[in-house]
Design a protein with these regions (language model features):
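Conserved N-terminal phosphate-binding loop of PLP-dependent enzymes in the Aspartate aminotransferase
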Residues: 1-293
Length: 293
């Protein structure tokens, strides 16, 4: 794994002769050079996320330039983001063309499907100098009529004026909404904040506590479903109106305020970091169990 947004990475790509391709997941722009958050991220306030579109665009442009110069295939993994950022996906959003792109069930309107797209020289099934030497691609679920129909309908709707209008001012709209929610949380002195990459949001905690994970249950009492894993992502539909969002913000603040009032944001003063204490407790419990056995 090479570091993102790093001159050293570009140097490696320029000088090594054994690199065939570079795979990029554009979602990493929300937290470059950090693994996907796990449940452990709920135990401390060390988690950070910040999306800088201009900086990540410059990085992708530099990466594209090096890949072109060295004959390296640039691949975008858009299974998660799909067409959330722009009608043309991350390629259109960042203004950088990949050689190959992967998509998932977004293209199938929610039906299970995997799609690989790319330029002709990488997608053709034979060499021009050996046309009979064909690369077969087979699968028992290939070209399923229902899935193909759903994909065609999705692409038609994606190209319609109605859907195209949803993308106008998308970043400005969702950045303003994230700022609005953070302001409401700050007004209530709640140790919770959000960071966003357009309509993909992540929940952050300002104070370390072994009970931060309980926010998901308080949100559920307000009718909001936060993933039970440590990712804490909120994925919004692009057609959310301002009225829809204000209702979500009201419920989010109400849930966090209830959790605070019930005392679950409390952190023990003058003690070792929560994560370190939990590791000790876990090891102690395992050792005790082994002695009993």
């Amino acid at each position: 794994t090479l570091s993102e947004m790093s001159d050293r990475t570009l140097h490696v790509l320029r000088t090594r002769r054994d690199i065939a391709c570079v795979l990029i997941n554009p979602l990493q722009a929300l937290h470059p050079n950090k693994p996907a958050p796990t449940d452990a991220s709920l135990l401390s306030n060390g988690r950070r996320a910040h999306f800088d579109r201009a900086a990540y665009t410059r990085w992708l442009q530099a990466l594209r330039e090096v890949c072109d110069a060295r004959g390296i295939v640039l691949i975008f993994d858009e299974v998660f983001l799909g067409f959330r950022l722009a009608p043309g996906g991350a390629q259109e959003y960042f203004g950088v063309r990949a050689d190959l792109v992967t998509y998932g069930k977004t293209l199938g309107g929610g039906l299970p499907v995997g799609v690989l797209c790319g330029c002709r020289k990488y997608m053709r099934r034979f060499r021009e100098d050996r046309p009979a030497d064909i690369c077969f691609a087979r699968g028992t679920f290939n070209s399923h009529p229902a899935v193909m129909g759903a994909m065609a309908e999705f692409l038609d709707r994606l190209d319609s004026p109605e859907i195209r209008a949803l993308y106008e001012g998308l970043d400005e709209r969702w950045n303003a909404r994230a700022a609005r929610l953070n302001a409401l949380l700050a007004e209530e002195n709640l140790p919770v904040r959000v960071a966003n990459m357009s309509s993909v949001w992540v929940v952050l905690y300002d104070a370390p506590s072994r009970y931060n994970w309980m926010l998901q249950f308080y949100l559920r009492t307000q009718g909001l479903a936060l993933p039970w894993t440590g990712t804490g992502r909120l994925i919004f539909s692009l057609d959310y109106t301002d009225r829809d969002f204000e209702e979500v913000a009201r419920r989010f603040v109400a849930a966090a305020a209830s959790m605070r009032d019930d005392g679950w944001f409390w952190a023990e003063p003058g003690r070792a970091p929560v994560r370190r204490r939990l590791v000790r407790e876990t090891i102690g419990a395992l050792l005790s169990r082994s002695r009993v056995a």
